[in-house]
Amino acid sequence: MPVAALIREEIEIPENVNVEINGSTVVVKSGAKELKRELMYPGIEISTEDGKVVIECAFPRKAQTAIVGTYRSHIQNMITGVTDGFEYKLVIRYAHFPMKVSAKGNTVMIDNFLGEKYTRTAKIMDGVTVKVSGEDVVVSGANKEFVGQTAANIEQATKVKGRDTRIFQDGIYIVEKAGKVL
């Protein structure tokens, strides 16, 4: 079975996006948005040529082949993040005790969950905004991983351990992530 001598992935850079590569650090800028990420793996080189980001690896092993594809996805997500951004939609569900959800600073506060007297909190990652309106929660930002982690933090804050989720359906649930309806 022949092995490829060179793996090369290319990513088109849109006109309004600037990509800088300093050693192993990739910086993607567009307007006021900027994302920076450290991408370093032995044998893999990242460069820019003719309006494209090029990821290359000579005589790759399985792990290096996988990492080249992973880096391509990371850079593509960075470009999408600074141009369009990412948005997760969550919905608040309750049967008897109405929840009060609010975002202040870098935390989301959930009051009166299942009639509890204390406030449950969820962390908001850097560069992410959370908007609560009625029974809808919208999490948005440029960094896909931070937006997803913030949405997961909010969902996990309302998990009830030891109860059947088919019966006890109170909570905050992700219904749409990065444009995909679940």
From Swiss-Prot:
One of its GO terms (biological process) is cytoplasmic translation. Transmembrane segments: none annotated. GO terms for molecular function: rRNA binding; structural constituent of ribosome. The keyword Plastid does not apply. GO terms for cellular component: cytosolic large ribosomal subunit. Keywords: Ribonucleoprotein, Ribosomal protein, RNA-binding, rRNA-binding. PROSITE patterns: RIBOSOMAL_L6_2 (PS00700). Coiled coil: none annotated. This protein binds to the 23S rRNA, and is important in its secondary structure. It is located near the subunit interface in the base of the L7/L12 stalk, and near the tRNA binding site of the peptidyltransferase center. Part of the 50S ribosomal subunit. NCBIfam families: PRK05518.1, uL6_arch. Belongs to the universal ribosomal protein uL6 family. This is Large ribosomal subunit protein uL6.
